[in-house]
């Protein structure tokens, strides 16, 4: 545990592969942990991110995608940067370190690189992986992003772009 008051929220998006049963099995295996399940009302990652963040009670919010392309063991590093005040928004990256073969399809890699170049230019801030699922920010800053979300509305299906643009404002 890297923080005293850790809350884990699983946002389940109506999967048909037994994910919800597995989540409940994990919860039963760790009765001393604060683990909750939220069943997604809408569709897509963006909706899941908003559902999780809106229901989180903590001051520091983290996203870890189920594909685990960023190892959970790296989360304490992200947490420390935010908790120490050295950063306000942390966007993970999968594209600066060697990846396993087939970890990302070529077209996804190419699109992500293209988004990274565009976002770096638009925001005047180096962004190496716009679609990395690992992101960390404070609840206070997330609430500011929500209050100013009108530039994207609910359009962002990934839940990545509105966070990146919102954090840059």
Which residues are covered by each model-predicted region?
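Conserved donor nucleotide-binding strand/loop of the catalytic core
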Residues: 6-10, 20-55
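Short, acidic, metal-binding catalytic loop of nucleotide-sugar glycosyltransferases
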Residues: 1-5
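Acidic donor-binding loop at a coil-to-helix junction in glycosyltransferase catalytic cores
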Residues: 154-163
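A conserved acidic beta->alpha catalytic loop
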Residues: 12-21, 68
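Hydrophobic residues within well-ordered alpha-helices
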Residues: 82, 163, 167-168
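Acceptor/aglycone-binding surface of glycosyltransferases and processive sugar-polymer synthases
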Residues: 40-55, 60, 72-154
């Amino acid at each position: 545990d890297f923080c005293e008051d850790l809350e884990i929220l699983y946002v389940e998006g109506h999967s048909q592969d037994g994910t919800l049963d597995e989540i409940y099995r994990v919860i039963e295996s760790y009765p001393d942990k604060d683990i909750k399940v939220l069943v997604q009302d809408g569709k897509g990652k963006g909706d899941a991110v908003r559902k999780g963040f809106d229901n989180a009670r903590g001051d520091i919010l983290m996203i870890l995608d189920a594909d685990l392309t960023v190892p959970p063991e790296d989360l304490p590093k992200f947490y420390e940067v935010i908790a120490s005040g050295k950063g306000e928004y942390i966007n993970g990256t999968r594209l600066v370190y060697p990846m396993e073969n087939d970890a990302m399809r070529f077209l996804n890699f190419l699109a992500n690189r293209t988004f990274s170049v565009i976002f770096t230019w638009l925001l005047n801030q180096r962004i190496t992986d716009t679609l990395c699922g690992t992101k960390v920010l404070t609840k206070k800053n997330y609430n500011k992003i929500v209050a100013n979300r009108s530039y994207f509305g609910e359009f962002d299906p990934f839940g990545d772009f509105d966070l990146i643009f919102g954090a840059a404002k």
